[in-house]
A protein has these predicted regions:
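C-terminal beta-strand-loop-alpha-helix "lid" module of Rossmann-like NAD(P)-dependent dehydrogenases
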Residues: 1-286
Length: 286
């Protein structure tokens, strides 16, 4: 059995760790609330924009997506992996990295590159795959304009023919304990499908509907990427809060076990001392 000093040192170490994880849990909980409010407010806008684009497209004949819907033979694929800049968030980053690798294997025999958004994804994926860019600084000041600039870069890579397909891989936020890895086709634009009936009312449009659609598509792409990053950002804080909650609980259990071990060891030491004293006294009597 470890001596009392070693056990006391372990209790002190575990207690210190518990304080750190508890503090990180509270910080993540505060950040989660703000991030959750942002993605909750974002989703209705994204859904309405998609609905508007769908209604306009349904009332037009032929290909109205222009260069954004161009279907080419898939030879070069760009996977946009959205992770975090920091760890200690459970399997949050691992799941995205694993899915990005799975998509790379799916396109075996083709050129597959990675566009990393987040330091953790860049650090791991760059070891086995080609990472052409890392936009980890976007999380320092997460705004629509900053994300829009990234979306424009991705769009240009597709329009110029540098890549034939671009996909997004990220964690979709459900709640603090649940994040679902999503893979979405970014470009070319996939046909918009919906179970809801399409409204094709008789409206007067200015400018023409096809011009409006071509104006809305870049906006929709920027919104799609912004929503994905916002989802990932909220998922990160939810995953970290959950991980730190579990770590705090485990540290508490370990501390309690160590205290029990310490008390047993201390009791055994005291008992041995008493026995030695009694034995010595009996020896003197004899």
């Amino acid at each position: 059995m470890a001596n009392l000093k070693e056990i006391r040192n372990r209790i002190t170490s575990v207690s210190s760790t518990m304080q750190i994880t508890s503090a990180m849990k509270m910080v993540s909980a505060a950040k989660l609330k703000k991030a959750q409010d942002a993605i909750t407010a974002m989703r209705p806008y994204a859904e309405k924009l998609t609905e508007l684009l769908q209604n306009l497209s349904a009332s037009l004949d032929g290909d109205v997506g222009g260069e954004f819907t161009t279907q080419r033979e898939v030879k070069k694929v760009l996977i946009v992996a959205i992770t975090s800049n920091r760890g200690l968030c459970g399997a949050f980053n691992t799941n995205v990295i694993k899915e990005a690798k799975n998509r790379s294997e799916y396109y075996a025999g083709k050129q597959v590159d990675i566009f990393a958004i987040g330091k953790k994804g860049n650090d791991i994926l760059s070891k086995t795959l080609t990472v052409i860019d890392n936009q980890s600084s976007v999380f320092d000041h997460l705004t629509f304009d900053n994300v829009a600039a990234i979306a424009e870069t991705l769009t240009q890579k597709f329009v110029s023919g540098e890549y034939d397909r671009i996909e997004l891989v990220y964690n979709q936020f459900k709640n603090a304990a649940t994040q679902i890895v999503q893979t979405e086709q970014f470009l070319p634009l996939a046909p918009i499908q919906s179970d809801k009936p399409v409204s094709t009312g008789d409206y007067i449009f200015e400018p023409a509907k096809d011009e409006i659609v071509l104006t809305l598509i870049p906006k929709a792409l920027k919104t799609q990427l912004y929503k994905g990053i916002r989802d990932s950002f909220a998922s990160e804080h939810g995953a970290r809060m959950t991980a730190m909650h579990k770590a705090t609980d485990n540290a508490t259990d370990l501390r309690d076990q160590l205290k029990l071990t310490y008390n047993k060891a201390r009791q055994a030491a005291i008992t041995n001392e008493i026995l030695e004293i009694v034995g010595g006294a009996e020896a003197l009597k004899g």
